[in-house]
């Protein structure tokens, strides 16, 4: 509803309403960010408040006279920050416009040399962006320690050679540092104000280098086995079905950002999964029929996973992730039993997990 009582849009989906109402919803959310720094415009288009139950951030609501009937709200330029100078950041916030309520999830956005605050309609999307924004803000406040770290990652040049099929040495270095920042400073619950942010910096600074060295060693172990698996696949002259299956597995495990994209617990298992590929190829010539039988059992399990991933269009799903890593353990059980699995795994176990996901 606008200031004259005309209905502009209904519903609680922020994305749809933002698309329908154009800059009006965006301007109202940006007004909230402006309020944090005392730079709010004189006449915001709506009341803006943190949602009930979220952390307070000082004065979070504003009411102002509406713009003239003929004037549409101008979108506000995002405010740039290089330090935590914007008060508390709530997990979610609301704007109210003539009885219409929109719920949004604020996040820090990485802009390279600065961060900005934006509001998302989906909490999962906000969480991903917010972590990246927090990492950037940390980096901007840890310039000297990071300058030292960039020059002292162990065996970086050697790792970069094995990383060449995936990316550059600089991309490898960036991933190692990003994960080191995550593990040193960004354990849950995440900092929500300047005091907790500074406390994280003080706590994590002393262990940053040790954590980065640990990550680099693990990345090196993964890349060593990746190179060996690639060589063995090239030399094995495996049947097309097997070669295609292994190539797809390697692509899943070893994306360009495998260090940053793989959870730390699973990153420690990647060398074993890659060694399992090598053992599978070693055994293939001796018993191709057994390999074909196991592959036939795997295919329907992986096909349903692939379909669900496509349906989610990038949205995170913890249970689907669990299923994905169980498939890797099943491959070890099928093709490289001597490497062992940390827990019993079978097709029945995966079917049970899938059934629980579908409930």
Q: What positions do the PLM features span?
A:
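A positional "C-terminalness" feature that preferentially activates on distal terminal regions of long
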Residues: 1-359
């Amino acid at each position: 509803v606008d200031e004259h009582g005309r209905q502009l849009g209904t519903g609680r989906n922020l994305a749809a309403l933002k698309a329908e109402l154009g800059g009006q919803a965006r301007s109202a959310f940006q007004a909230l960010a402006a309020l944090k720094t005392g730079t709010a415009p004189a006449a915001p288009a709506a009341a803006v408040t943190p949602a009930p139950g979220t952390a307070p951030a000082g004065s979070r609501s504003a009411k102002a006279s509406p713009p003239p009937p003929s004037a549409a709200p101008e979108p506000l330029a995002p405010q740039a920050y290089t330090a935590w100078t914007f008060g508390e950041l709530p997990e979610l916030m609301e704007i109210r416009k003539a009885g219409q309520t929109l719920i949004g999830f604020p996040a820090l956005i990485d802009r390279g040399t600065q961060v900005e605050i934006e509001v998302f309609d989906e909490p999962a999307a906000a969480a991903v962006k917010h972590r990246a924004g927090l990492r950037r803000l940390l980096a901007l406040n840890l310039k000297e320690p990071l300058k030292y770290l960039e020059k002292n990652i162990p065996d970086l040049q050697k790792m970069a050679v094995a990383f060449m099929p995936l990316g550059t040495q600089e991309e490898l270095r960036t991933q190692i540092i990003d994960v080191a920042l995550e593990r040193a400073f960004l354990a849950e619950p995440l900092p929500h104000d300047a005091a907790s942010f500074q406390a994280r910096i003080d706590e994590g600074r002393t262990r940053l280098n040790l954590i980065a060295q640990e990550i680099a060693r693990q990345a090196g172990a993964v890349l060593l086995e990746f190179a060996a698996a690639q060589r063995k696949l090239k030399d094995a002259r495996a049947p097309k079905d097997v070669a295609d299956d292994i190539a797809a597995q390697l692509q899943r495990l070893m994306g360009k950002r495998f260090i940053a994209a793989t959870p730390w617990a699973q990153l420690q298992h990647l060398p074993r999964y890659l060694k399992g590929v090598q053992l599978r190829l070693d055994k293939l010539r001796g018993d191709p029929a057994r390999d074909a039988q196991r592959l036939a059992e795997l295919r329907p399990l992986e096909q349903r996973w692939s379909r669900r991933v496509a349906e989610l269009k990038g949205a995170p799903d913890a249970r689907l992730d669990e299923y994905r890593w169980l498939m890797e353990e099943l491959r070890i059980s099928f093709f490289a039993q001597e490497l062992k699995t940390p827990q019993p795994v079978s097709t029945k176990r995966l079917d049970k997990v899938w059934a629980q996901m579908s409930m």
